[in-house]
Amino acid sequence: MGLNLTSKQEIVAEIADVASKAYSLVAAEYHGLTVAHLTQLHARARENGVYLRVVKNTLARRALADTEFKAAEEKLVGPLVLAFSMEYPGAAARLWRDFFKENDKISTDIVKFVSISGEVLAGSEFERVAKLPTKEEGISMLMSCMLAPVAKLARTLDAVRQSKEAA
């Protein structure tokens, strides 16, 4: 049974709202995935701050029209599951990467495209996006870069003090 107009409008509004808040989008074909696979993906998505939804492509196109994922509209072909990263840019790509590691019989070719910062990347690029650091990892990397010169200065001053004491 098809969706009525009100249901379609609600779906478009929901997807548009999610897309306006999302950092990235990963679209993959769900053809060939079992119900158990999709259930596993949905559970992991909730844990990792990823909004996962199977939606008709025409509704997805309308929802993405006024978002930064507008460039992905023409790539919405075939049976797709959309994964929006809600907490950091690489969350959806990591979800798929971890899923493929656990289910090695499923080909990574089912990822059709990745959209991030208004650009659409090929599906094969999802590994690169998955390697993006989380917010905490990024802050940690920045802090280590900022602390390294201070630590080096402290070691240098300590070495000068020790050489004066030895003399």
Curated annotation (Swiss-Prot):
GO molecular function, a single term: large ribosomal subunit rRNA binding
Record's GO cellular component terms: ribonucleoprotein complex; ribosome
InterPro entries registered for this protein in UniProt: Ribosomal_uL10 (IPR001790), Ribosomal_uL10-like_sf (IPR043141), Ribosomal_uL10_bac (IPR022973), Ribosomal_uL10_bac_type (IPR047865)
Superkingdom of this protein's organism: Bacteria
UniProt keyword list: Ribonucleoprotein, Ribosomal protein, RNA-binding, rRNA-binding
Pfam family, one: Ribosomal_L10
Entries under Gene3D superfamilies matching the protein: 3.30.70.1730, 6.10.250.2350
CDD domains from the UniProt entry: Ribosomal_L10
Any Gene Ontology biological process: translation
Recorded family membership: Belongs to the universal ribosomal protein uL10 family.
PANTHER family attached to this UniProt entry: 39S RIBOSOMAL PROTEIN L10, MITOCHONDRIAL
NCBIfam families: PRK00099.1-1
Purpose: Forms part of the ribosomal stalk, playing a central role in the interaction of the ribosome with GTP-bound translation factors.
Assembly mode: Part of the ribosomal stalk of the 50S ribosomal subunit. The N-terminus interacts with L11 and the large rRNA to form the base of the stalk. The C-terminus forms an elongated spine to which L12 dimers bind in a sequential fashion forming a multimeric L10(L12)X complex.
Name of protein: Large ribosomal subunit protein uL10
Origin organism lineage: Bacteria, Pseudomonadati, Pseudomonadota, Gammaproteobacteria, Cardiobacteriales
Chain's gene name: rplJ
